[in-house]
């Protein structure tokens, strides 16, 4: 018997990584899970190294980042690797979630892995926001001011919660201290949830492009899918290094290279690009509390997908109407991202409201309606046989 099967710990790892049975028809859209694991490892390694040289003090934070860039051996590489991996993390998780929505991987028996995945996504957004503040440039300061101020929309307790988050009456040294402590902790929390996600997925088994049960035709994870994952890992590293070495600031904001100054407001206050769709939803609602509720609901509404999708067939492989609807949803989400970075002026205000209505309508109206219509078509088709 092989050593990996004799030892109890190695046997458990072997059942998840090497000998794990997988459907035989998985395509490259199933490779984003391994890329997300790679992103998490890179973030942990670079983040711990950066924390050794970073100073979480309002007067020293910006200078400590510049010290890392100029004086620490390969500090520029570590800092840019950490910043760009955050962007690639979101690229991969958006692609991963989009694949799950398209192929119906949230349906029974994979409701638990999907729910844990949505929680991971929410934690990732919070972690990225706190990390962005730590640079303490202009956009960091005003981003923290604006985003934390949204909590004040909560009736009765809002103002007190904002002061608790800031550690005072404005963004300052206590804010950096607590954000740094939480930002250091959150990746380990994410790692725990990623492990829970993997356990839940191992219990239910992976879905496949056809949306059918694949118990009769499976392959071991190694060597078939491990080598398949390596192809996208190398492609990922190629794109990643191109950004780190040649365009490290392409996905960032130039205002964050200006030290934080509470007396000077930037021309426009926008979050990082990966949060722009939800920022557009926030701005589409004139009422402050309504905007906050809509922004949070835009994330949490993903949890109801297993309920609102009434289709008797998993995935969109054989559903042309659902394919078209999903295409509109993706285009709408990308348009929300564009609207999140433009100034609030006509016609962008109305366009943002239309896109927000379509976003929520997709989950609450269009998906249940289209899935019901397609069920009727499938039923009629089965009667003709």
Swiss-Prot record:
Q: Name the source's superkingdom.
A: Eukaryota
Essential cofactor(s): heme b
Primary localization:
mitochondrion
Q: Which GO terms describe its biological process?
A: mitochondrial electron transport, ubiquinol to cytochrome c
Q: Which residues cross the membrane?
A: 32-52, 76-98, 113-133, 179-199, 225-245, 289-309, 321-341, 348-368
CDD domains, from UniProt? cytochrome_b_C, Cytochrome_b_N
Q: How does it sit in the membrane?
A: Multi-pass membrane protein
Q: Which InterPro entries match?
A: Cyt_b/b6_C, Cyt_b/b6_C_sf, Cyt_b/b6_N, Cytb/b6-like_sf, Cytochrome_b, Cytochrome_b_C_euk/bac, Cytochrome_b_N_euk/bac, Di-haem_cyt_TM
Q: So where does heme b b566 get bound?
A: 96, 197
Signal sequence range: none
Q: Which UniProt keywords apply?
A: Electron transport, Heme, Iron, Membrane, Metal-binding, Mitochondrion, Mitochondrion inner membrane, Respiratory chain, Transmembrane, Transmembrane helix, Transport, Ubiquinone
Q: Which Pfam families does UniProt cross-reference here?
A: Cytochrom_B_C, Cytochrome_B
Which residues are a ubiquinone-binding?
Answer: 202
User: Which residues are listed for heme b b562 binding in this entry?
Assistant: 82, 183
Write out the similarity annotation.
Belongs to the cytochrome b family.
Q: Could you tell me which PANTHER family the record lists for this protein?
A: CYTOCHROME B (PTHR19271:SF16)
Summarize the protein's role.
Component of the ubiquinol-cytochrome c reductase complex (complex III or cytochrome b-c1 complex) that is part of the mitochondrial respiratory chain. The b-c1 complex mediates electron transfer from ubiquinol to cytochrome c. Contributes to the generation of a proton gradient across the mitochondrial membrane that is then used for ATP synthesis.
How is the quaternary structure described?
A: Fungal cytochrome b-c1 complex contains 10 subunits; 3 respiratory subunits, 2 core proteins and 5 low-molecular weight proteins. Cytochrome b-c1 complex is a homodimer.
Protein name in UniProt: Cytochrome b
Organism, scientific name:
Yarrowia lipolytica (strain CLIB 122 / E 150) (Yeast)
């Amino acid at each position: 018997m092989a050593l990996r099967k004799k030892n109890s710990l190695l046997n458990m790892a072997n059942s998840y990584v090497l000998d794990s049975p997988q459907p035989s028809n998985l395509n490259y859209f199933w490779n984003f899970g391994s890329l997300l694991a790679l992103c998490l490892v890179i973030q942990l390694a670079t983040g711990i190294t950066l924390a050794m040289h970073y100073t979480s003090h309002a007067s020293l934070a910006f200078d400590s980042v510049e010290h890392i860039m100029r004086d620490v051996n390969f500090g520029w590489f570590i800092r840019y690797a950490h910043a760009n991996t955050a962007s690639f993390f979101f690229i991969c998780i958006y692609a991963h979630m989009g694949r799950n929505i398209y192929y119906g991987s949230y349906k029974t028996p994979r409701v638990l892995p999907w729910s844990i995945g949505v929680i991971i996504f929410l934690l990732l957004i919070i972690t990225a926001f706190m990390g962005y503040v730590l640079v303490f440039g202009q956009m960091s300061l005003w981003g923290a001011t604006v985003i934390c101020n949204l909590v004040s929309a909560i009736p009765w307790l809002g103002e007190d919660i904002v002061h608790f988050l800031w550690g005072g009456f404005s963004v300052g040294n206590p804010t950096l201290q607590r954000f740094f402590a939480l930002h250091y902790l959150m990746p380990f929390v994410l790692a725990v949830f990623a492990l829970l996600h993997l356990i839940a997925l191992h219990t239910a088994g992976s879905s496949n492009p056809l949306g059918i049960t694949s118990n009769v035709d499976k392959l071991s994870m190694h060597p078939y899918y491990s080598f398949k994952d390596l192809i996208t890992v190398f492609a990922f590293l190629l794109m990643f290094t191109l950004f780190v070495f040649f365009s490290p600031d392409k996905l960032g904001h130039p205002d964050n290279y200006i030290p934080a100054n509470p007396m000077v407001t930037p021309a426009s206050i926008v979050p990082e690009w990966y949060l722009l769709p939800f920022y557009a939803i926030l701005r589409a609602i004139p009422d402050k509390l309504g905007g906050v509720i809509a922004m949070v609901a835009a994330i949490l509404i993903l949890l109801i997908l297993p309920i609102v999708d009434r289709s008797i067939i998993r995935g969109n492989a054989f559903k042309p109407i659902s394919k078209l609807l999903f295409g509109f949803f993706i285009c709408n989400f990308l348009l929300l991202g564009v609207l999140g970075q433009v100034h609030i002026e006509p016609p962008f205000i109305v366009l943002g409201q239309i896109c927000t209505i379509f976003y929520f309508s997709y989950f609450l109206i269009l998906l249940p309606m289209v899935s019901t219509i397609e069920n009727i078509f499938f039923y009629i088709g089965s009667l003709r046989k």
